[in-house]
Design a protein with these regions (language model features):
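Short, Lys/Arg-enriched N-terminal segments with co-localized hydrophobic residues
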Residues: 1-10
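N-terminal DNA-binding module of tyrosine recombinases/phage integrases
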Residues: 10-20
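Intrinsically disordered, low-complexity, repeat-rich regions
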Residues: 18-29, 41
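Charge-rich alpha-helical segments
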Residues: 21, 38, 131-134
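Generic secondary-structure transition motif, activating predominantly at the C-termini of alpha-helices
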Residues: 24-28, 54, 95, 99, ...
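Non-catalytic DNA-binding core/recognition domains of DNA-processing enzymes
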Residues: 32-123
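Short, charged hinge/linker segments at domain and secondary-structure junctions
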Residues: 57-68, 123-152
């Protein structure tokens, strides 16, 4: 276990990689194979986004921890090191135009999955919606804005 990973467990958070695995598995359960594939594309895109942009959504201290973790294992640092509380701050940017998937149906799935992900995180108390209200509201607003853009 790396130094940074040890810090995560001290913070008592479930790593983003486990959060996303559980959420996307639950979301795909019983769905049509085409929908499961679409959800897989959204998950892969979210993981790519977190690798590319995740640092810009966290504090300087957390960014320094991510840089340290990448010295040990370059790929997947955000998912290994951080928890749901940091993920919720990254989600609004994932719904911004540069990060929306090009395929119409994939894009709608991306918007819907992220909107439901925030609710899922709050309902399972992985994110305190009162403490992180701003990030939760920003994600919901970003989802609504992206949904309007996608359907008009």
């Amino acid at each position: 276990m790396s130094v940074a990973r040890g810090r995560l467990w001290c913070m008592n958070q479930i790593p983003v990689e486990q959060v996303l695995g559980r959420y996307f598995s639950a979301s795909a359960a019983g769905r049509h194979p085409a929908t499961v594939e679409r959800y897989g594309r959204v998950l892969a895109h979210l993981r790519f986004f977190l690798e590319q942009e995740g640092d810009s959504t966290v504090s300087a201290d957390v960014g320094a921890l991510l840089a340290l973790e990448r010295q040990f294992e370059p790929e997947g640092a955000f998912e290994r090191l951080l928890g749901a509380e940091q993920l919720v701050y990254a989600l609004p940017r994932f719904l911004s135009p540069p990060w929306l998937l090009p395929d119409f149906h994939d894009r709608l799935a991306q918007i819907s999955l992220v909107s439901r992900l925030v609710q899922w995180l709050c309902s399972r108390e992985l994110v305190d919606s009162r403490w992180h209200r701003h990030a939760v509201m920003q994600t919901r607003a970003a989802a609504e804005k992206a949904r309007r853009r996608a359907t008009t």
